[in-house]
Amino acid sequence: MTAVRVYRDDGPLSRALGRTAGGRLPPLPFTVLAAAATGVLLAVGPQPGTRIGPEPAVFAPLVVLLLAGPASDHPHTGRLDWLVPPILRGIEYGYLAVLGDARAVPVPLVYVLLTVLALHHYDAAYRTRQGRRPPRWVRLAGLGWEGRMLFTAFAGLLAPLPFAYAALAAYLGVLSGGESAATWARHGRAGGVMVDLTKKLSEGVGDGPHGEREKRA
């Protein structure tokens, strides 16, 4: 899997559609089309201050999934295919921000969710550049961009949307934050240099001009 495909952060649904298409669909045109469709659906709904319902914005995640998902198995080796992940981030972040604003989700809660997502994506990108890609189970458990969008869209049908935002932020924070901290701690112990400070300090008494004076004393 190429780094660009890792940066996409596809979930199980998008990956399944990608395998069905067999990697034959070019990713960039369909992702741009998905972004345009999301913008249109958000522009016509939801209406501010109303409960989420059968409005066009509810179906935006499904439309994006059907457009961008089938291209997820493409190797993304085209000259401009590196644009696909940031466009998907813009779709996801923009959808969550606009939907939260329209559904009266507290601004701090929207900010927390977007911050958790940004840290999740930054960690995945940094680890990939270091040759330590997140394990497959973490990528699947993270639901992917499509799973998170679908969750927030349809969870509002069963409960107030702030609860969905809070639950998603807490879940991703524990999953990504805990696994990331454990991974870096494990690699730090494996690849770091162990220093015996007590020994170093005792040896340091004889080092340098001050140490020489202490030795002579």
Set out the residue ranges of the language-model regions:
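Hydrophobic alpha-helical transmembrane segments
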Residues: M1-P70, W82, P86-T128, R133-A217
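Helix-to-loop junctions at the C-terminal end of transmembrane segments
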Residues: S72-G78
